């Protein structure tokens, strides 16, 4: 397992400067090692993403993190180069997606076997209600910490951002639909944001998983350019149906 980790880290370092397809936290600080027991690191050998453990057997992320390559899922990870004692590796047993990636950027992954809850592994609660505009929410991930040149840290970074009305994002990014199952969040002054390799990571508001890092237009952390996050609350029936074993679960219209 140590040899696998060494090889994986070398590949990540080699590929990090070419990474373009997913969204790290700019303007944040190193996360506390005990702050993110639900945070999953998804690695396919070409790109890496984040995800959120929502129970012992399921991880929630976004569709764009599936590049059809074999995926390893690390739980309980903090420092990429040095495994925690309770760190675990799993593989996808099943992946469930919604059609139309731009409209429904969400993916539910069933792990090949359940993880063990521990000091650094524990699920995050799904939302009981949608988040309120004006909420201060938490973002985190191993994505790039510099917007102009990709610089990927060894430990995840965390930051606080604000939740805005969706119309703010419509005004900031051309071509967005009038209505959307997305949340709009960021810092209008710029300087704090998710970015390359943060895709699939959590937007945490009031201690619950309210959003998933999904999409942005142009460069990260720009003034008046908040990002878009898949609104988890709108997908609760779909998520719960799949976990319950439904083969006919449909995405929200």
Swiss-Prot record:
Protein name: Snake venom serine protease homolog HS120
Span of domain Peptidase S1: 25-244
Record key words, sorted: Disulfide bond, Glycoprotein, Hemostasis impairing toxin, Secreted, Serine protease homolog, Signal, Toxin
GO function terms (MF aspect): toxin activity
Family annotation (InterPro entries): Peptidase_S1_PA, Peptidase_S1_PA_chymotrypsin, Peptidase_S1A, Trypsin_dom
Signal peptide: 1-18
Tissue and organ distribution: Expressed by the venom gland.
Subcellular location: Secreted
Cited function: Snake venom serine protease homolog that may act in the hemostasis system of the prey.
GO (cellular component) term, any one: extracellular region
Carbohydrate attachment residues: 116, 165
Residue runs in coiled coils: none
Family that this chain belongs to: Belongs to the peptidase S1 family. Snake venom subfamily.
Propeptide: 19-24
Listed transmembrane segments: none
PROSITE patterns to which the protein is assigned, alphabetical: TRYPSIN_DOM
Organism annotation: Bothrops jararaca (Jararaca)
Disulfide bonds: 31-158, 49-65, 98-251, 137-205, 169-184, 195-220
């Amino acid at each position: 397992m140590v040899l696998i980790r060494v090889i994986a880290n070398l590949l990540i370092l080699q590929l990090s400067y070419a990474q373009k397809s997913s969204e790290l936290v700019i303007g944040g600080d190193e996360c506390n090692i005990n702050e993110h027991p639900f945070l999953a690191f998804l690695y396919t050998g070409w790109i890496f993403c984040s995800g959120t453990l929502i129970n012992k057997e399921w991880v929630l992320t976004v569709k764009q993190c599936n590049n059809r390559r074999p995926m390893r899922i690390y739980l309980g990870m903090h420092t990429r180069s040095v495994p925690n004692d309770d760190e675990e590796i799993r593989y996808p047993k099943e992946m469930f997606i919604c059609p139309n990636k731009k409209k429904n950027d969400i993916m539910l992954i069933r792990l090949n076997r359940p993880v063990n809850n521990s000091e650094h592994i524990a699920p995050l609660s799904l939302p009981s209600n949608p988040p309120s505009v004006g909420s201060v929410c938490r973002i985190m991930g191993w994505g790039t910490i510099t917007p102009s040149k990709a610089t990927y840290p060894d430990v995840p970074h965390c930051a606080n951002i604000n939740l805005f009305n969706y119309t703010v994002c419509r005004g900031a990014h051309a071509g967005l639909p009038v209505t959307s199952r997305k949340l709009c969040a960021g810092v209008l002054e710029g300087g704090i944001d998710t970015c390359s390799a943060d895709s699939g990571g959590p937007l945490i508001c009031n201690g619950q998983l309210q959003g998933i890092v999904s999409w942005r237009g142009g460069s990260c952390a720009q003034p008046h350019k908040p990002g878009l996050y898949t609104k988890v609350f709108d997908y609760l029936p779909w998520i719960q149906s799949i976990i319950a074993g439904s083969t006919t679960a449909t995405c929200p219209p």
